[in-house]
Amino acid sequence: MMKANVKECPGADRIEGYGMNLLDPTAQFPDGKHFDIIWMSQFLDCFSPEQIESILTRAAQIMDGDSRLCIMETFWDRQRFETSAMCLTLTSVYFTAIANGDSKMYHSSDMDEIVRRSGLEVEVIHDGIGYGHSIMVCRKNR
C-alpha cells in the first residue's frame, strides 16, 4: 500500500519499505547503507515502553550521524486544546484496559526518556501537524 501511495510522488524512487516483525527482539533492521529518514508513524503507541525501546534500539543500530528517526504521534501533553488532551487520555484508557493491555497515548517526556534509553536523542519536536499530531525528530546520541 505504501509503494502505491508514493508511486507518483517526487522522490518515490528513494522511498523503501521493509517488512519485519518489529516485536521480535531478534529481528534486525536492514543494514549496509545510509538511511536519511526512518519514519515511524502512529504505531509506537500500540506498544509497551520496553517494546518501544527494543524497536528504537534496533533502529539506532543502523543509523549514522546524518540519519534521522521521525516519530509521529498524538502526544497528549502537546495538544493545543485541553479537550483534545482529555480525549487522548481517555482513548489511552480504552486501549490499555480493553484493546491489548499495552497501548497508550504517551506523554512526550515519557517517549523522550524511551528515546534516550535507546541510544537516540530528540533533536526537535514539530507540533500542530494535522489535528493534533507531533513529529519527534531523533538522531543518534553524540
Describe every region a protein language model picked out.
Residues 1-142:
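Alpha-helical subdomain
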